[in-house]
Amino acid sequence: MNDNCIFCAIINKKVPAEIIFEDDQFIAFKDIHPIASVHVLIVPKTHFESINDIPDEDSTSLSNLFIYAKKIAKQLGLYESGYRLLINTGKDGGQTIPHLHVHILTGKINIPDQGK
């Protein structure tokens, strides 16, 4: 855990969030600034700053992230109609929170201008 990370604070229940799923590996909650009609974040409880920080030999963490994304999409009723998974990595990739997370999005998506 990282004391300066908002997602770690949500995991530790120090910051409120609208949690839709949680187990010992992941937490999923609604984005407080949604860019689509459905915008959920899936966050590993292990603090990785980005996908680049997952060790190559740790394929389980990454595969589980996508398995959970599929399960949560099904729970939200998006499985049949479709959804988008998005991972932003690094500043130029649009990452604003330095804790690995996957966005589940559906509907019209409004990606804000990032000053580029």
Where in this protein do the model-derived segments appear?
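HIT superfamily nucleotide-processing domains
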Residues: 1-116
